[in-house]
Amino acid sequence: MEKNMVDLSKRRWFTPNRQPNQSQVRLPWLARPDAFTDECTRCGKCVTACETHIIEKGDGGFPNVNFSMDECTFCYQCAQSCPEPLFVAQSEAPWQAEVNITHHCLAQQQVECRSCQDACPEGVIHFALQIGRTASPQVNSELCSGCGACVSVCPSNAMTVHYTQHIA
């Protein structure tokens, strides 16, 4: 690691046994998200294929994305490993998402923290300076890929990724 670089994984030491603060997130690139539970055979191949290990078996054995430990790199391995025709092409957008910041955010409690901004690969999270207050996080939702990089590094579990719709 370069000198003066922040090791974001060390920030996880402050949040042991944390529970994800988000609703159920289905896999990216689903052709028909509303029919996913009817068409998925729950074989688990996507779970083992995921390079960041964020896909896990959820309710009923159906795969879900859990951002509490890492982010989606959009490697497309989940889709390539699936024996069923559930996914659209990788050239399509994986989903539409927006990041929500809850009241648990340290910056909103006047504690300086920019973990989410440091982790965001698209740079969609920035902090607006305010006179007499800690800088406030702002998200450009239109540019957010929904990768979840901001979720796992947040020491107060204040970040959630909400999927507005999957794109087919």
What is the role of each PLM region?
Residues 1-168:
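Non-ligating segments of multi-cofactor redox enzymes
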